[in-house]
């Protein structure tokens, strides 16, 4: 908008809008990895808490608390309580230092800043520059549009080199980036799959701000209205920050299509840019290692071969901080074999009565899943054939012929476990 007396530029001049959750990597998780050397698998708990010194309860966008999770999941699904907890661990001084390294001025940081709902307001240009440092191995370049001026004589020129500095360690840049890749993935609860560009390695973060209860009444807003929607994403070549909203705060975003607009616009722009200058993939630096850990362990433990797939994850660590101890929580599971197996021949009916017992029936076993029994039969030493799968402990086998040799085998089954057979 270049009309009017002040030539207002939303990209550069708009510093009155809150950034929402796009601030979380900059003020919470980036500093936690940089200064505390947190892993992407660091355990956190999404639970009901209040702001320090207040009875104001902190909520999540869906009104739920999801319990124990990794900080990776907490960030890519944009949970609020883990963000506030992370800010508490980092502390306002280190958060301020990290922001300052990215060209963002701040003072008097409070816990509401952890969610991008405080006084740290950032223009889209500054937001793009800050995120670019994550994709640039931790190096921050001040935003600029002019690199060289040639004077009227056509010979004299002056070049401008932007300020460039190391804002964070390469491990911080990569580990934050790796989490933010999940934001644009198809993972469950990922917030920006609409920003993904096929074949392009992209990382990014969404952000949404809220109206206060007084504003809902003042502006007569309908439920679900929001004032701002952000998406900031980057590759190894480009960083783009897109804000969506209206110049007047009283005019609200009221539909999901409006909320998603920054994502779809990002995708359109990045698709075009990448066709002309393709971006390479983000490269893991030597300062970062990966390990398979037990989700929710504290301190983190390495997963062993018996750890269920649902309870382990491969996460990133600053080299030298990865766990060395394996979990002892998960051990080989054995299922008791059936006992007291008997078979009797009923010549008149030409059938066999086969029965057995199992520890799951008297409570002496440790089985938690229901137990069923697979019954197999061999005739005269031939191949075994499964003749029944049952939860009972007795079956009748018809068509038994006198003079033949029958061998019955019973195997207990519970979930993925199979016992040794009883014959």
Model-derived features: positions:
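Short beta-strand elements bearing conserved aromatic residues within extracellular beta-rich modules
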Residues: 373-375
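Short beta-strand segments within Ig-like beta-sandwich modules, predominantly Fibronectin type-III
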Residues: 385-392
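Mid-domain, small-residue-enriched loop/turn segments at the edges of structured enzyme/sensor domains
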Residues: 56-58, 91-129
């Amino acid at each position: 908008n270049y009309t009017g007396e002040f030539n207002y530029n939303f990209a550069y001049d708009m510093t009155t809008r809150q950034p929402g959750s796009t601030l979380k990597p900059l003020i919470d998780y980036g500093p936690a990895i940089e200064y505390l050397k947190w892993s992407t698998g660091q355990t956190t708990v999404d639970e009901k808490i209040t702001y320090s010194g207040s009875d104001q309860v902190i909520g999540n966008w869906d009104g739920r608390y999801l319990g124990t999770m990794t900080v990776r999941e907490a960030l890519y699904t944009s949970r609020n309580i883990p963000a506030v907890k992370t800010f508490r661990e980092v502390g306002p001084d280190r958060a301020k230092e990290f922001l300052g390294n990215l060209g963002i001025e701040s003072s008097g940081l409070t816990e509401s800043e952890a969610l991008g709902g405080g006084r740290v307001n950032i223009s889209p240009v500054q937001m793009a520059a800050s995120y670019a440092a994550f994709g640039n191995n931790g190096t921050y370049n001040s935003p600029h549009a002019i690199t060289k001026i040639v004077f009227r004589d056509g010979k004299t020129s002056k070049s401008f080199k932007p300020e460039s500095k190391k804002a964070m360690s390469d491990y911080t840049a990569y580990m934050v980036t790796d989490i933010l890749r999940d934001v644009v993935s198809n993972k469950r609860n990922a917030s920006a799959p609409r920003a993904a560009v096929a074949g392009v390695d992209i990382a990014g973060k969404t952000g949404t701000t809220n109206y206060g209860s007084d504003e809902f009444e003042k502006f007569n807003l309908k439920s679900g209205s929001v004032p701002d929607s952000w998406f900031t994403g980057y590759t190894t070549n480009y960083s783009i920050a897109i804000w969506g909203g209206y110049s007047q705060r009283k005019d609200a975003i009221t539909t999901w299509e409006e909320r998603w607009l920054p994502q779809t616009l990002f995708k359109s722009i990045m698709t075009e840019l990448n066709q002309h200058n393709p971006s390479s993939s983000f490269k893991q630096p030597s300062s970062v290692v990966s390990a398979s850990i037990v989700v929710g362990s504290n301190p983190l433990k390495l997963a062993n071969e018996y750890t269920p797939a649902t309870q382990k994850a491969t996460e990133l660590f600053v080299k030298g901080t990865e766990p060395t101890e394996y979990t002892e929580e998960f051990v080989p599971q054995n299922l008791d074999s059936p006992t007291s197996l008997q078979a009797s021949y009923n010549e008149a009916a030409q059938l066999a009565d086969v029965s057995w017992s199992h520890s799951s029936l008297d409570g002496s076993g440790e089985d938690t899943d229901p137990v069923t029994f697979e019954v197999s039969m061999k005739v005269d030493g031939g191949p075994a054939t499964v003749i029944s799968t049952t939860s009972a402990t007795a079956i009748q086998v018809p068509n038994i012929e006198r003079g033949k040799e029958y061998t019955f085998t019973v195997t207990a089954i519970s979930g993925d476990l199979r016992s040794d057979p009883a014959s």
